[in-house]
Amino acid sequence: MPSQVLKRVFDEAAQLSGIPVIFRASDSLQTQANLKMARNGELAHIIQYHTKYAMQKEYLGTFQAGFILRAFGANQSNRFEVGSTPSGRDEGQKLVSEHFQRLGVNLPDNKLRHFASAIYDGLGVQIRSVPVGLRIDSWILTNYPELKEQQ
């Protein structure tokens, strides 16, 4: 049963987006929590938190729901997704390859592709998540001071 804070935030996210929020524990996540925002007719936004962080689940759920609120709170004409393209991925691999060549490092193609992909995807996640995440944390601190100890 979600806390009053989670219920309020999830209800607001569902009302704003027109899509319900499912919140559940998982012991297989690689992170503390994640969000799979509903797209292309999916029936729910899914927020998961790792069972190791159950003591912080109110904060983790509120933080992830903040991404839904920010995405759907923007005018539809101003919404966009940060994502990768095949040409961007190819350019990233080329840049990483050139850098290794300058260093005199010779990686097999499969390792180079794997490394370049990790760098490319990691940078994309950071560019997309960190600025918004900082704003969400500030919003939580201002609007839900009872979660401060979990932040």
Describe the function of each predicted region:
Residues 123-136:
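Solvent-exposed aromatic/hydrophobic patches embedded in short alpha-helical segments
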Residues 70-119:
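Post-HEXXH active-site segment of zinc metalloproteases
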Residues 57-76:
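Active-site recognition of the HExxH zinc-binding catalytic motif
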Residues 45-61:
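Short pre-active-site segment immediately N-terminal to the catalytic Zn-binding motif
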Residues 135-151:
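Pan-zinc metallopeptidase signature
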Residues 6-17, 65, 69, 140, ...:
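Hydrophobic, Leu/Ile/Phe/Ala-enriched alpha-helical segments that form helix-helix packing faces
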Residues 1-41, 54:
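Auxiliary, metal-adjacent structural segments of Zn-dependent hydrolase domains
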Residues 41-48, 114-122:
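Short linear interaction motifs
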